[in-house]
Every structure is written in C-alpha cells, then in structure tokens.
Amino acid sequence: MYSILIACSAAVAVCLSSWRLADAVWGWALLWGALAFLGAMFSVNYLVRKRITAVMAGMQALLADGQKEMQARVNAFQNRPTGDPKRIMAEMEKFQKKLLTQALEHTMKLEPFCKWTLLFSRQLNTTLMQFHYQMQDFKKVDELMPRCLILDPMSGAMKMARQHVNKAPVEEIEKTFFKAKARLKYNQSVLLYSLMAWIFLKNDMPDKAHALLVKGCKDNENETLNRNRDRLANNKVREFNNANLGDEWFALFLEQPKIQMRRQQPRLDGRPF
C-alpha cells in the first residue's frame, strides 16, 4: 500500500533526523518517528478519501437520475396501461442494465485507489459485485464474492441467495446469515431474516423457518415478518410472501414482481381521454 510506504518513509526520515539532533537519545527519536508515521498516514488517507468521495458522489448522482427516470416510466404505465406488460418490463430491464453499465464504468475510476488505502480493494469488489448482481451477471458475481466485504444487509443477502442457487448446504447458508446479522443493529436485518426463512421453506423446513421468524420479530419491527410468522404458526406455508419487502426482495432475483396497473378514473365530460 502506497500510503503505508509513504508513512514508513516519513517515520524513518524523522526518526533518524531526531536521533542525530538529540545526541543519540533513541526514545525521543522513536516518539517523533511514530508521530510522523501517524501524521503521514492521516494526511495521505484524507486526500485519497476525498478523491474517492468525489467519484462516489458522481456515481450516486448518476444512479439517482436514472432511478427517477425509470420510476417515471413505471408510474406512467401504471396510470395509463397501454401496451404489453411483458414488453414494458423488458424495456425497464434494458434501461436498468444500461444504467448499471454506466455506473460500473464510473466505478472503475476507483480502481487506482486500491493501491493507496488498506482494504479498499475489498470494498470496491463489494460494489462491483452488487452492480454485476443487478445486471444478472452471476458468473462474475460468484467470481468476486470471495473477495468482498459483507458488511451490509444487501450484500449479505446476495451471498446467501447465490449460495442457495448454487445448491450450497443449508447449514453453510445459515452460517452466512448469522455472520451477516451479527454486525447489524435493531431493525436492520429484516431482509436477512425473510430470506433465510424463505430458504428454509424451499428446503422443507417450516418449523425452522417459523422459529427463525419468531426471533426475527424480536430483532425487528416489520409487518412482513409479523405476517409471515403468523402464517407459519397457523400452518399456512403457501401464504408465505416476501413481496411486501419491495425492491430489496426482488433485487435478489429469486422471485419476479408483478406489474400492478391502476384503473383509470372515467372523465366527467364523457371524453375517453
């Protein structure tokens, strides 16, 4: 890492200079060397993170503008449902893929900083993995996953989803769940609990799914968790549904959303439009 090399060079230079000026008193020389190391590390990391923040801000702005445009198209179709819903869905997926490709290209501007900041390469791999996941490039996702930092609910859920699709043992997926959940605070693990319960049901383990949701309702305040817990308690396994989690759930591509079309209100002047 360049930042460590620069800090070490500064520390050695200051240490040797202090030793000569202090008549071979190594204690003071080492102290000034340590302070030089910390000062150099702070300065370099501050400048690098400032550049990283600027690139990330540009990427977030790009995604925000794209999401607004995509939501406007969806709302327009729901308010005035003309055309084939499947064609509209295909157009939305095409637009989203184009947007993610642009964001991915923008993110690659961060690659040079991997040599400057400790662990940043793993953070960047996590961001790249999430973009490739949304583009459904799962081969690349599986390639990047071992080099990612699983620190947020979505990246943890993505890892669990890939393990499920790749037919990993349930015990292995459960380990990923507990590891990802351990870092989260109250009301942050809804997606992880919902996904793990769904995986239990897919493996014919309704009792484990119900027990998990009971714990999940203690760690979170969420209507979907409560509803699914009650359904499993009443043996209504077929009514288990995570659709109310919205985009977070469907972003895992384990289930497909349904386009809901709003009924148009008739005009009072008798004109059809």
Regions found by a protein language model. Give the residues of each.
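Helical anchoring/docking segments at protein termini
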Residues: M1-G58, K258-F273
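N-terminal topogenic membrane-targeting module
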Residues: V25-N125
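Short coil/turn linking the two alpha-helices of tandem helical-hairpin repeats
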Residues: M59, G66-M70, Q136, V165-V170, ...
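Residue-level recognition of tetratricopeptide repeat
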Residues: Q60, Q130, A161-R162, W198-I199, ...
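Hydrophobic/aromatic side-chain positions at a characteristic register within alpha-helices
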Residues: L63, M92-F95, Y133, H164-V165, ...
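Alpha-helical adaptor scaffolds
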Residues: Q96, W116-L195
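Alpha-helical repeat scaffolds
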Residues: T101-L110, F138-R147, P169-L184, P206-G216, ...
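Long, non-transmembrane cytosolic or organellar matrix-exposed soluble domains/tails
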Residues: R183-F273
